[in-house]
Amino acid sequence: MQPLNGRSWSPIYESRPNSGGTYLVDEFYVPALERSVRYDRIAGYFSSTALAVASQGIDALLEHGGEMRLVVGTDLYKSDKPVLERLGDELRDSLEELDDEQLDAHLQLLARLLRENRLHIKVAVPREGSWQIFHPKMGIFHDDDDNALSFEGSVNETIGGWKRNYERFKVHRSWEDGEDAYVDADVDTFEQLWSNEHPFVEVYDLPEAIERELIDWKDPDSESEIKEAIQIARGEAPATELDKANIIADGPLTPGGLAL
């Protein structure tokens, strides 16, 4: 496995047009996962569609014996509910009973990570009553040489965040003087949250959050996002907007194309 400090990372990443929406995934998310043994993530929103988008990197993380720890807000997606609701102690065995063939591809990946104890999810709620939601967005990649790469910006752990929106975030490297203090602060914040020792935020294990009815099960932003995630998880490349435009433009040149 290549270490995190063996690659050149930009100080800032932002979405780029005409990349098919894959720039952040291809240039940052997957390469970072491929070099990591742990991925710690704080996000306002999480969806298993994000796992599908980065499935290549997730596979590499698993090959390294790695794991993911997520601290997320209370807004989770209805499409993930059939799997996430089985996390309670009395229901955890039912994860083994899920028929993967009856699950969409992105849910198969979610169920697999949970079964193998490679994905751990906690839910955060602000202690201050006037604060409506938990909304920070930060992540930390760790390799087996004790290097860490942290990022903070606008991107949520969803397909929309990594692929469909205009997003921008800054990156800090633990092995670079002047950047290590930012990484240390990010690690401290995450560990405070994970151990429920943050002064301003209450953190629950996901099964407890579900039992307390803290979760707001929201609809996906669009059905097309789910379909796109399924295609990616299956290894199928979804058509880009440019592809679609070319199909329409070339319509008259195709057999029967005058009907397009």
Please state what every model-predicted region is.
Residues 1-258:
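PLD/PLD-like phosphodiesterase catalytic module centered on the HKD motif
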